[in-house]
From Swiss-Prot:
Family affiliation: Belongs to the UPF0434 family.
Full protein name: UPF0434 protein Shew185_1670
Any single Pfam family the record assigns to this protein: Trm112p
Organism: Shewanella baltica (strain OS185)
Taxonomic lineage: Bacteria, Pseudomonadati, Pseudomonadota, Gammaproteobacteria, Alteromonadales
Domain of life per record: Bacteria
Amino acid sequence: MAFDKKLLDIVACPVCKGKLEYDKMTQQLICKADKLAYPITEGIPVLLENRAVPLTESV
């Protein structure tokens, strides 16, 4: 199932409540403010703080 980019208009980072960006290559939602990536499972964003992955300098 593909991620519906329309969700970006209504979802927010659960940590800072900021805007998320979709990374097509990694299939994740990215919060640049907190430097966190949230997984997307079967087209559904998993916006749980304990599932977030810290971004590395190379990302």
